[in-house]
């Protein structure tokens, strides 16, 4: 694992820590300030722009929209220059979601520019070849 991949995994872990702790200030600090951002929450229309994205997280974290617990499992980091992404499973009560988190390097730190989470079918209904 490269140093950049470790840094990206640390940024990804900070995202899930902010989510689990329902900390809107920590969540805000993780999102890019210069690069355009977007987010696709499960069941929502896509959100574009920092104000809409960070505002959605503030509502989710403070108004009861967050799951009671969430764990990031099987994270896989990929780095291409100043851009990186993590593909992982989000484990929540009652199921799993597939998630992709994209990051860019801003002022020396990895900042999130996109989060997309989608529900996975139950294990019995997953297609052949699905890797768990």
Give, region by region, the residue ranges found by the protein language model.
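Helix-to-beta-strand junctions that scaffold the AdoMet/dcAdoMet cofactor pocket
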Residues: 32
């Amino acid at each position: 694992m490269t140093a950049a991949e470790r840094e990206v995994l640390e940024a990804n872990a900070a995202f899930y820590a902010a989510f689990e702790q329902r900390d809107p200030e920590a969540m805000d600090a993780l999102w890019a300030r210069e690069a355009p951002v977007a987010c696709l929450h499960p069941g929502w229309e896509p959100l574009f722009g920092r104000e809409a994205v960070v505002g959605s997280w503030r509502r989710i974290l403070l108004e009861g929209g967050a799951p009671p617990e969430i764990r990031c499992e099987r994270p896989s980091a990929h780095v291409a220059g100043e851009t990186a992404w993590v593909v992982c499973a989000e484990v929540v009560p009652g199921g799993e979601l597939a998630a992709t988190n994209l990051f860019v390097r801003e002022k020396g730190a990895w900042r999130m520019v996109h989060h997309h989470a989608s529900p996975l079918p139950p294990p019995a209904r997953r297609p052949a070849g699905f890797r768990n």
